[in-house]
Amino acid sequence: MNIIQGNLVGTGLKIGIVVGRFNEFITSKLLSGAEDTLLRHGVESNDIDVAWVPGAFEIPFAAKKMAETKKYDAVITLGTVIRGATTHYDYVCNEAAKGIAQAGTATGVPVIFGIVTTETIEQAIERAGTKAGNKGADCAVSAIEMANLNRSFE
């Protein structure tokens, strides 16, 4: 049996990151976690490009455009959606998740889902580097692994 898996060495990888500006006090921490993790795994600073978009709903569009350029080994998406009093949360979360999945399958470039979806601001803050780790850092590790896995299929 052959086992195919990506390693966690970022040397030589080019990574795109799409970040939603809405709830920027949280998404900026997710971005910092992602950038720090990429650098610690060997990705060069000049091989990381960041595109800011208005919010989570716009992330799939930019992620797909970024992936379509074929300049990136992986694209990380970072955003935060916090439930409010209306159904807006459900629509944004569902459509963003679908769009991000489609961006990866349509382009053949790994697109990593890093949208934090929570019931409260406190839960979002926890996932941006306090009690529950940093989702941006987790996504960076996934991006490196998937980029290297994808290369093994070429």
Curated annotation (Swiss-Prot):
Keyword Lipoprotein: no
Binding positions for (2S)-2-hydroxy-3-oxobutyl phosphate per the UniProt entry: 85-86, 127
Annotated InterPro entries: LS, LS/RS, LS/RS_sf
One BP annotation, GO: riboflavin biosynthetic process
Active site: residue positions: 88 (proton donor)
Molecular function in Gene Ontology: 6,7-dimethyl-8-ribityllumazine synthase activity
The reaction(s) this protein catalyses: (2S)-2-hydroxy-3-oxobutyl phosphate + 5-amino-6-(D-ribitylamino)uracil = 6,7-dimethyl-8-(1-D-ribityl)lumazine + phosphate + 2 H2O + H(+)
Pfam families: DMRL_synthase (PF00885)
UniProt entry keywords in alphabetical sequence: Riboflavin biosynthesis, Transferase
SUPFAM superfamilies tied to this protein: Lumazine synthase
Pathway connected to this protein: Cofactor biosynthesis; riboflavin biosynthesis; riboflavin from 2-hydroxy-3-oxobutyl phosphate and 5-amino-6-(D-ribitylamino)uracil: step 1/2
Gene3D superfamilies in alphabetical order: Lumazine/riboflavin synthase
A GO CC term attached to the entry: cytosol
EC number: 2.5.1.78
Entry keyword Repeat: no
Positions annotated to bind 5-amino-6-(D-ribitylamino)uracil: 22, 56-58, 80-82, 113
Subunit details: Forms an icosahedral capsid composed of 60 subunits, arranged as a dodecamer of pentamers.
Role this protein plays: Catalyzes the formation of 6,7-dimethyl-8-ribityllumazine by condensation of 5-amino-6-(D-ribitylamino)uracil with 3,4-dihydroxy-2-butanone 4-phosphate. This is the penultimate step in the biosynthesis of riboflavin.
PANTHER family: 6,7-DIMETHYL-8-RIBITYLLUMAZINE SYNTHASE, 6,7-DIMETHYL-8-RIBITYLLUMAZINE SYNTHASE DMRL SYNTHASE LUMAZINE SYNTHASE
Similarity remark: Belongs to the DMRL synthase family.
NCBIfam families the UniProt entry points to: lumazine-synth (TIGR00114), PRK00061.1-4 (NF000812)
Protein name listed in UniProt: 6,7-dimethyl-8-ribityllumazine synthase
Gene expressing this chain: ribH
